[in-house]
Amino acid sequence: MSKKIGILTSGGDCAGLNTVIRAVTLRAVNKYNWQVYGIKDGTLGLMTNPLNIVELKPKDFDGHLMRMGGTFLGSNNKGNPFNSDISDQIIDGFKKTKLDALIGIGGDGSMKILQALTKKGGINFVGIPKTIDNDVKENELSIGYDTAVDTATNALDMLQPTAASHRRAMILEVMGRDAGHIALNAGIAGGADVILIPEIPYSLKSISRHIDRKSVV
């Protein structure tokens, strides 16, 4: 039996989103003969009148699109979907689409939102973890994390010549919020002298002493 599934991206953008959308579309259409619909701008696409959705075909994904960062469907992290009025609009919009299931690509916040909508509105929901923070539980690697670590490592590599030339201590701050995965792994790969992550308490005095010892050497 043919199925209709929807796919959306929610929250911040990252590398790899268009590739995931392509993989879902190719598998669903070519193997199962299902219809795939992209929902524009995250859950906002289910709140507009008319609904902001578009059918996706394998031919839509050319080489140029695959080289683009971000998500061609658009995304958003505005508003509060836990608000009853907003969640009701999203659920009503989903029902109007007559989709059999919804695939949501998002981070920990997006997963919580879509899970709540599932419980409230009976939406068949499949989550694909996407976050450079790599902080989605029960998941080893999230979409976007590897590229974030690689980018931060390259930044460290570029900082080191300037730091050495001017005898300066350089600080590179990376994203991650309450998760130190990017800082830890980029710091190791880039040869950082000190790595600070939110999971482990640290003392500024001990860090200062360590830097002083390094500067003497």
What positions do the PLM features span?
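N-terminal phosphate-binding or glycine-rich loops at protein starts, especially the Walker A/P-loop
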Residues: 2-50
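Short glycine-rich or small-residue beta-strand-to-loop segments that form or flank ligand, phosphate
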Residues: 4-12, 71-76, 100-104, 170-173
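Short, ordered loop/turn segments at secondary-structure junctions
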Residues: 10-13, 39-45, 77-78, 107-110, ...
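Short glycine/serine/threonine-rich phosphate/pyrophosphate-binding segments
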Residues: 13-24, 46-47, 82-88, 102-115, ...
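A glycine- and small-aliphatic-rich helix-loop capping segment at beta-alpha/alpha-beta transitions
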Residues: 22-30, 52-59, 116-126, 143-147, ...
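Accessory alpha-helical/coil subdomains and C-terminal extensions
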Residues: 36, 93, 101-106, 112-116, ...
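Glycine-rich oxoanion-binding loops at beta->alpha junctions
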Residues: 46-104, 109-110, 143-154
